[in-house]
Amino acid sequence: MSLCTVEINLSTIKNNYLLLQDICKTSLVGAAVKANGYGLGAVQISKALIEENCRHFFVASSEEGVNLRNALGLDVNILVLNGVFEHDALELIEYNLTPVLNNLKQIEIWQKFSNLKNRLLSCYLHFNTGINRLGLSSDEIEQLINDRDLLKGLDLQYIISHLAISEEIDNPYNLEQLNRFKAYLQYFPNVKASLANSGGIFLGQDYHFDLARPGAALYGLNPLTKNPVTLKAPIIHLQNLTLDSHIGYNMTFTTKRDSVIATLPLGYADGFSRNFSNQGEVFINSRSVPIVGRVSMDLINIDVTDLPPSEIFLGQEAEIIGNYCTPDKIASIIGTIGYEVLTNLGSRYKRKYIG
């Protein structure tokens, strides 16, 4: 097991959830816990949020749904965003998982198994209003409007859609999607609706409908919510190098002075991108320390020359992610997003849950 530790503060995640619930007022707030809770632990996060009365959990696949159902029991709703396929339909039924149906083929499959089991099967419908990934097209929606028998045997619980650019509050595309969604919903007046992802919650009450589906904001990937994640790594090696010494593969860093270089036990095998080579920073006792040389599979080097000698020793912990270096801040260094930083947190890291 890695010497590095990811600490996840469940109290912070719960507080983020309560903030979002407060903004949504009377609308329900679920939680996106796909990709193992954005790399932080879907089971642990879901159990914590159940304590705050969260009852809707969104996963990507049936496999994720089964794992969550086994951990949580039957008293919650687990929604499978990728929908249903012939190979996993029986599994969804067995584990009481609700598929989000994204096209007419998935509706057909779910109807087939409704007939096979001779009972109503619950589902959500996903209407594509402009993100153009998953979701029923305008032509498919029109078919549903004109032929309600296409939904026979299905217990339609929610109609959902997904915003493409909700992080940009003033972008007119948000309103375009909202208006398309409302136009479709008028043909399904008795069905509950869900549109707001994390960013959508902050667009205002018009976007909240009956259920909001935050993911990123729960995990601190929003300016108004707090980061619950800390990643720390101990110094495992120290060396004194003279002027003009080369560091790491391909000698991409050369010392410009006599230097003290420390080595930390993480690398790209742990999801710490090679793009951080010779850029980025870690923190030791709140002080910024630069990464020097190439990020290798299991190791990175940092220049600790400017730290007080009393703070440089084997076992001293460096903070890679935390209050000084949030996932969003780290992501900006290499041109990605905080989501990727979190979901790339390696399986070798020890996970520690507090709060």
From Swiss-Prot:
Cofactors (names)? pyridoxal 5'-phosphate
Query: Which residues are noted in the entry as substrate-binding?
Result: R133, M297
Q: Keywords, A to Z?
A: Isomerase, Pyridoxal phosphate
Pathway(s): Amino-acid biosynthesis; D-alanine biosynthesis; D-alanine from L-alanine: step 1/1
Entry EC number(s): 5.1.1.1
Protein origin, superkingdom: Bacteria
Q: Where is the active site?
A: K34, Y249
A single GO molecular function, which one?
A: pyridoxal phosphate binding
Q: Which Pfam families match?
A: Ala_racemase_C, Ala_racemase_N
Post-translational modification N6-(pyridoxal phosphate)lysine, affected residues = K34
Keyword Cell membrane listed? The answer is no
Major enzyme class: isomerase
GO CC terms in record:
cytosol
Tell me where the transmembrane regions lie.
none
Q: Does the keyword Transcription apply?
A: no
Catalyzed reactions per annotation:
L-alanine = D-alanine
Against CDD domains, the record matches this protein to: PLPDE_III_AR
GO biological process, any: D-alanine biosynthetic process
Q: Which Gene3D superfamilies did the record assign?
A: Alanine racemase, Lyase, Ornithine Decarboxylase, Chain A, domain 1
Function of the protein: Catalyzes the interconversion of L-alanine and D-alanine. May also act on other amino acids.
Q: Which family does it belong to?
A: Belongs to the alanine racemase family.
Checking HAMAP family in the record gives: Ala_racemase (MF_01201)
| Protein name, per record | Alanine racemase
Q: Which gene encodes it?
A: alr
